[in-house]
């Protein structure tokens, strides 16, 4: 959240190579931050203008150190997003199951129909797989090579699991599920947002193919 941050870590291009710069918030101009519209309205995102900002050499990280640091930041944040999406998936499943246990259609609880039970179980299985991947990634994160593979697996599976669970939540709530009044849309928006952070599931699987084969 750029509006609340005291310092900004900015990725820049320096002579054609990536570099990192630490910028104090008070070095920015009064109109440097512009709130962006993102699909998940519970998130805050800002465009930051750095026009006229000057930094000293000790606020700059360049060369191989910058490349390694950027890669490390990418993996750390990917794992954190994956863990958050696992929690979101569990909450989404609980939300859906509560509805299936209370909503009646034709005199029967809709949760008694196999057409709804089976996809709900599929969502739970996908969640358990994602959670296992997140645990494995956290355990092996510092291991050379293995940590990156496990983290990318976790990110891909967590995004897949939450997207599936959120889609089923909207579907099972019927027409109500497509409205702003139903919280199912919040889970789908969070799934879209999380999947897009640091590479979506397809991107992660492509990187995995390069790492493993």
Place the predicted regions along the sequence by residue:
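Short, structured patches in soluble enzyme cores that scaffold and shape functional sites
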Residues: 11-14, 22-25, 52, 74, ...
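Structural motif
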Residues: 7-9, 18-21, 46-47, 162, ...
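A generic structural signal for well-ordered coil/turn residues at beta-strand boundaries
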Residues: 3-6, 16-17, 42-49, 75, ...
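Flexible, small-/acidic-enriched active-site or ligand-binding loops
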Residues: 1, 25-60
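A short core secondary-structure module
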Residues: 1-31
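Alpha-helical interface subdomain recognition
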Residues: 72-213
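Solvent-exposed alpha-helices and their adjacent loops that cap or buttress functional pockets
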Residues: 1-4, 13-15, 38-43, 62-65, ...
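Short, glycine- and charge-enriched coil/turn segments that flank and shape catalytic ligand pockets
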Residues: 56-65, 142-146
């Amino acid at each position: 959240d750029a509006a609340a941050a005291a310092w900004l870590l900015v990725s820049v291009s320096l002579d054609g190579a990536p570099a990192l710069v630490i910028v104090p918030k008070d070095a920015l101009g009064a109109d440097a931050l512009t709130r962006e519209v993102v699909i998940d309205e519970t998130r805050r995102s800002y465009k930051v203008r750095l026009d006229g900002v000057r930094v000293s050499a000790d606020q700059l990280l360049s060369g191989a150190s910058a490349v390694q640091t950027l890669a490390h930041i990418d993996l750390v944040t990917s794992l954190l997003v994956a863990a958050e999406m696992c929690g979101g998936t569990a909450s989404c499943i609980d939300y859906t199951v509560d509805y299936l246990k209370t909503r009646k259609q034709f005199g029967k609880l809709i949760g008694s129909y196999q057409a709804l039970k089976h996809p709900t179980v599929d969502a739970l299985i996908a969640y358990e797989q994602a959670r296992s991947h997140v645990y494995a990634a956290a355990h092996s994160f510092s291991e050379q090579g293995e940590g990156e593979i496990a983290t990318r697996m976790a990110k891909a599976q967590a995004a897949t699991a939450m997207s599936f669970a959120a889609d089923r939540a909207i579907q099972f709530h019927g027409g109500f599920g497509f409205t702003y009044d139903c919280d199912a849309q919040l889970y789908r928006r969070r799934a879209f947002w999380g999947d897009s952070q640091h590479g979506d599931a397809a991107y992660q699987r492509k990187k995995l193919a390069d790492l493993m084969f």
